């Protein structure tokens, strides 16, 4: 009787015992009167020795990635044949029976990490690519993480509830994927960009703790960290403040990182306001794995004769600097030109620099800083071989963002980023609105259901631009991992927000009437967050693309080479739906 086991179950106790394993053939080695088959299942690899004449005839027909059943005797390898790189490298199975379960066609690419297959080819044969250990292990880790999330939240009395995937189209910034209704011709459902409104309705229904591993959909251009369909941990709680949500997420992530990749996170994550993050790092999702920080030098240059700085300060703009210690010799003219191109992209008044040599400014704009030279050297503790970069703009945010991108570029070029670090950061107190100078209109900075901070509510309409919301983001290594807020639970306040962003009563009733009605029936104060599962696993596994951690992702054109979707449908289907296809060129 053969004991059915998996490859990882081979051990000393099974020596000289009969075992049976079902697996795929990873490698074949012919050695005259015997053949070695390296086999693989989901759990591990193992080696099979074939030396009986009748079995050799079968083994000679076997090719790579055949699915086979092996029955045999587990034996120890000779000392000179032990493979220390395999967990099962001390054993091999002496084959007694071989059954070919299924053959495999000629492979489109080798099932190895260093194959040169194109992305489209790998996606077309995703079921083969998933046999690679590195890819397989990422998917398994994802499964472990979501299992931990569920257990963690259920233990804390959260309810896992499912919200609809056919919803009313209420665009949240990106385009909706729409679904035509056959029954209601001319009408459309949308696939949800998030369960936002439904999770708020769940709070109004009295379920005070909700979560969902939610599938979400956005019709936007694909890029490295985005897909048209994605997964997020969506959760909401009644009667909470943001600090309650911070603590919950910190404890959950501590558990996930410890159990999945054996990393001990701090029990509490660092926190910073949006304004401080912009001033210090030039980003609302700063990478804090390195210390390179922005500083505002406007006060020190208030009497500057350099026209760019003089005009900026006259217009109440901002001058930002970045000091790189003891690295001036690393910045050639060509490298500085590359940094200047980044500044141009952000339409700043340019990027300027000077170096410190012989305790004086040298090169760049040194000649324009003679008056302030010694004061700046003393104030900023400048030393020989330091270099200072300056950028100026009439708009504070533009100056910050430009220098923030330059900060990242410098850190990458100088190797300042510790790739083994996991640096979490809460960014909070975001502006509630964004203002478009061209259209002279306001739009939500995050979404239109976030609560303004208490001190801004009374005079909300007088100065929307300065209104701060109860909004927070969770950042990991410079990537926005999650976003949340305390929500509006008052109909009147929600209507005021709608009006500021240009939704007059008729429009707000048409799009959100069902939700406004619900706010009239005893809505609790509530708040929540959504954490991107795909991004989380991508960062935990140090993957370069989000596609690596999704089982069946789309390519960069939001298409699937595996099943050739999206595809055209028949004229009969179109007729049933009441749809006519119009040539886009007409």
UniProtKB/Swiss-Prot annotation:
Annotated catalysed reactions: tRNA(Asx) + L-aspartate + ATP = L-aspartyl-tRNA(Asx) + AMP + diphosphate
GO biological process, one term: aspartyl-tRNA aminoacylation
GO molecular function list: aspartate-tRNA ligase activity; aspartate-tRNA(Asn) ligase activity; ATP binding; nucleic acid binding
First-tier enzyme category under EC: ligase
Keyword Ligase among UniProt keywords: yes
Record key words, sorted: Aminoacyl-tRNA synthetase, ATP-binding, Cytoplasm, Ligase, Nucleotide-binding, Protein biosynthesis
Localization per Swiss-Prot or TrEMBL: Cytoplasm
Binding-site positions, ATP: 218-220, 227, 480, 532-535
Keyword Cell inner membrane: no
Source organism superkingdom: Bacteria
Region (Aspartate) location: 196-199
Site features described as Important for tRNA non-discrimination, chain residue numbers: 31
Entry's EC annotation: 6.1.1.23
Main function: Aspartyl-tRNA synthetase with relaxed tRNA specificity since it is able to aspartylate not only its cognate tRNA(Asp) but also tRNA(Asn). Reaction proceeds in two steps: L-aspartate is first activated by ATP to form Asp-AMP and then transferred to the acceptor end of tRNA(Asp/Asn).
Name of this protein: Aspartate--tRNA(Asp/Asn) ligase
Gene name per UniProt: aspS
